[in-house]
Design a protein with these regions (language model features):
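Conserved N-terminal beta-strand and adjoining loop/helix that marks the start
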Residues: 1-20, 71, 86-89
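Hydrophobic pocket-lining residues within nucleotide cofactor-binding pockets
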Residues: 41, 63, 72, 92, ...
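NUDIX/MutT-family hydrolases
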Residues: 89, 98-130
Length: 135
């Protein structure tokens, strides 16, 4: 029997004009909640490589000034999943925001940090509850 182990997720906190970019999740755990672009860290990948790849795949934009920010320990009881989520910050660089994965995201929207939507994806909620601020 294979032992369950936590997985490593990455969230990219993209900043522009004092706001952060969040997407409304669908088709996966956390459906209906708002989350940063991101995903799984692949074997041999740096955090910066993962951030650029995930943002390109999900949002279709370029980012710059990627910096390590924080991490959370996230347990999804209902789904029986456990993640260590590493967050990086990045500045918006170029491109038009698009829904690149319509089966996974309903919309992308900019929010002020002190006015985030109520229904946050567990890692984002945990990050906010830690008192973290990207500004």
């Amino acid at each position: 029997m294979e032992q369950q182990r936590p997985k490593v997720g990455l969230g990219v906190i993209i900043k522009k004009d004092g706001k952060v970019l969040l997407g409304k999740r669908k088709g996966s755990h956390g459906e209906g909640s708002w989350s940063f672009p991101g995903g799984h860290l692949e074997f041999g990948e740096t955090l910066e490589m993962c951030a650029r790849r995930e943002v390109s795949e999900e949002v279709g934009i370029k980012i710059k000034n990627i910096k390590n920010a924080a991490f959370t320990n996230d347990i999804f009881k209902k789904e029986q999943k456990h993640y260590i989520t590493v967050f990086v910050t990045a500045d918006y660089s170029a491109g038009k925001i698009k829904i690149m994965e319509p089966d996974r995201c309903d919309e992308w929207k900019w929010f002020k940090w002190n006015a985030l939507p109520k229904l946050l994806f567990i890692p984002v909620r945990n990050l906010f509850n830690q008192g973290y601020s990207p500004f």
